[in-house]
Amino acid sequence: MALSSRYHGKILIVTAHMTHIDAAVAIQFKDEIRAEIDDNAQHVILDLAEVNFIDSSGLGAIVASMKQLKGGRKLDLAGLTPTVAKVFQLTRMDTVFKIHTSVDKAL
């Protein structure tokens, strides 16, 4: 699995370096993103610009990551490709997450 993270001020940016988040990788993705998010991160941006496909298992992993953040901490999404954005729209997950066109716009 390929995730990287960096801080921009107090904002943690986690980038997914993969083309698919599906049932085959969802559990590992969830575990790795949880490991990337430390207790100091009050605001997390998940950069999905490299992801071209996501299924319900992938959505579930992202929702689980959001639920890990408690006490006013938040998870925003950035850089969704048109295909991934469509999945978020069809499942109405676009009403659950704040979605930005890019990481720069999310900052």
Predicted segments with their positions:
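Short alpha-helical segment
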Residues: 105-106
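Short acidic-hydrophobic, aromatic-tinged amphipathic segments that line or gate anion-handling sites
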Residues: 98-102
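Conserved beta-strand segments of the P-loop GTPase G domain that flank and frequently precede/overlap
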Residues: 14-16, 46-47
